[in-house]
A protein has these predicted regions:
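Repeat-based scaffolding regions
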Residues: 1-179, 183, 190-199, 204-205
């Protein structure tokens, strides 16, 4: 990344801002920019950077960053993600991230409410896996949730696949972002989203 070659913080910040604006399919530029801001003592600005990026591209990387940057307790954190989801242009994906936050913080009511807000056409395998996870957590002491869990797992097996890191050049997917595609060695084409070979599996909205 060119920003790594810049010794001055201001120059590095400028390049990271440019990189963030280049493609909303990338999380690294916003994460790096927020890290620089946090190191410079500008934590509020770092939080704003991540929140802005989250509203454009809801991603678990941003959940982790916000969890580290804020002093929120469990309820406050899930509430923060809920407010961001309501303001996001990718509402369904944002509420999926809110559900993940609710599950991670063990706030079941918030996780359930977030999952209910996701439209039927956006219910990918990740949605059903989270539904199964929620049912499994609730099953402790109440076996009535076992059937709900099992049904969600069956649905996950046949549901459309959600977004992944994938290369626009060759279509290969990976578990994590890379500057250069591991399959075709093309630079700067790996981003987050639904790959071309999966787009036709997701019902039109």
């Amino acid at each position: 990344m060119i920003a790594d070659l810049k010794e001055k913080a201001a120059d590095r910040h400028d390049w990271l801002t440019r990189a963030a604006g280049f493609s909303e399919r990338l999380t690294a530029p916003a994460l790096r920019r927020a890290d620089d801001e946090h190191r410079a003592g500008k934590t509020r600005q770092a939080i704003k950077t991540i929140e802005t990026a989250f509203k454009a591209l809801p991603h678990s990387d941003y959940l982790e960053a916000l969890s580290n940057l804020t002093d929120d307790n469990e309820g406050q954190f899930v509430s923060r993600i809920g407010k961001l989801a309501a303001a996001s242009k990718n509402t369904d994906k944002s509420y999926l991230m809110m559900a993940q936050a609710g599950l991670d913080k063990r706030i079941w009511a918030s996780a359930s409410a977030a999952l209910e807000k996701i439209s039927p056409t956006a219910r990918t395998n990740q949605f059903f896996l989270m539904t199964a996870r929620l049912a499994e957590m609730r099953r402790v002491g109440d076996e009535s949730f076992a059937a709900e869990r099992d049904n969600a797992l069956r649905q996950a097996a046949i549901a459309p696949r959600g977004p992944v890191w994938w290369c626009e050049s060759c279509g290969a997917s990976d578990e994590q972002w890379q500057v250069t595609c591991g399959s075709c060695d093309t630079f700067g084409q790996v981003g987050w989203g639904v790959s071309n070979d999966r787009q036709n599996l997701i019902p039109a909205q």
